[in-house]
Amino acid sequence: MAIIKINEVNKTTRLTNVNETMPIIALIGPTTYGPVGVPTEIYSEDEFNNIFGATYSETYPYAAIAAKKYLSQQGVVLFTRLGIGATAASYSIGDLITITANHEGTYGNNFSISIKSAIVNGTTTYKITTMINNETEIFADLKNFTLSELKEKGSIEMKYVTLTAGTALTVDSILDGVDNKSLEGGLNGDIFFNSEETKQTDLNNLITTLQGILQQLEDPQIYEFAIIAMPGICGVKNLSANGSGIVNGNTVVDQFVTLTESRKDCVALIDPFIESSYQEILTDLLMEEVNSCYLSVYYPWYNAAVPELNSNILMPPSVFYLDACATSFHINKPWNAVAGPLTGKCSNCINTVIKVGSKMSQALNNMFINPIVYNRNFGYYIDGNNVLNSAANTRTYSQLGIRQGINYAKRELTKLCHIMSYKQNSSLVRSEVLGRVSKLLEGLKAGEAIYGYRAYINESVMDMADGIIRLTVKIYPTPALEEFVFDFEIVNSESALNE
């Protein structure tokens, strides 16, 4: 197995880029359909619409909007539907049959069904079709069945609904025809903090639900992504307040810190509260207690045109950043942190709720927060390139461009070491390790992700006898000699493999 120890030092002053394929991003948020709490890799807008619904949730559409924008630029999204207390809609015909939506949520409420009977070869056969919003289009979801078949099987699962036999159903029962009957009783689970009376309970439920989702995302070998966000939901007033009353004392920000610092290969995007002035951001988000190289905060919220909704809506700044990423990553170099008037631009920004000028922008950057600013020549763009690391000794230690490039190198080196740990010829593996490391880092150097590197293996006689490779990789992001140091211990002896 590969045992990895990492020590990082960086005091450099130059931004970094890397010319690689678009990174995978992880998004968490409500949708109108699909499995709740199941991380799902999505590769196209059509696939997203098929799995999570083509329409947006009424209260928190931000994650779905960001996902579709990123997918439209040939990116890959690891999407997890968030639904607290979501239930599936259904419809019953007496005690004979129940039709239930396969997934919880608004989509279930909008399902309509039609049931018609016909005599086929002397047997009464029923045909059920499903539609959405009472439209005539049938979503390839129709089924012919007999009552004896349903009685024998107990249930019949279709693409969008499941038929279940009722207690009174017999093979001689007669089902009344149904025409465009809507399913009822579904709850989409995305209306958080609906009243002051239930806010604390709703918050605890959100924290508990999020814990379950983030636990699934802890292992980078199972789910790979470079950026994770839960757009807009971190921006609800009092979400991080009253920490002592929250489940296990954890806030949303705390959980993202725990996840990203455990994985050490991704950055979490955090939104401020909608009403926050720039002086209040640190207090509102409890940022005075959070110093992490794996969080990036953006400000302020903005109004955006959303063609699918045929309206303008208020959007969290993390979506602005992801929108800029979708375009910039596809055209330029994806590991360059999106900032500046040429790359940090959003395609549909109308205005920001607070107009950020040069002085406010400088103040926000001094707090390691990335502002959305306006310039008459360039329009709205991100004027910051920071992770939230206010404890850093130097400004550049917190540059998001360096963080992303190093995260990528770290992830690829880790994969390489795991592969090498299963090679059984120790001397052969030593040369192969250095060869593969050089090939990886030469590519990053050519793509301007790093300025230089050095890789070497401890040639201890004892290590060689035990089949252990101690690999040290030093990466220099800039012409300065300060470095990121990666220490890997690879155990690849036959005895270790057979233990």
PLM segments and residue spans:
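Structured, hydrophobic secondary-structure cores that serve as assembly/anchoring elements
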Residues: 1-92, 97-100, 215-499
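Small/polar, repeat-rich beta-turn/loop motifs that tile beta-strand-dominated architectures
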Residues: 2-4, 9, 13, 25-29, ...
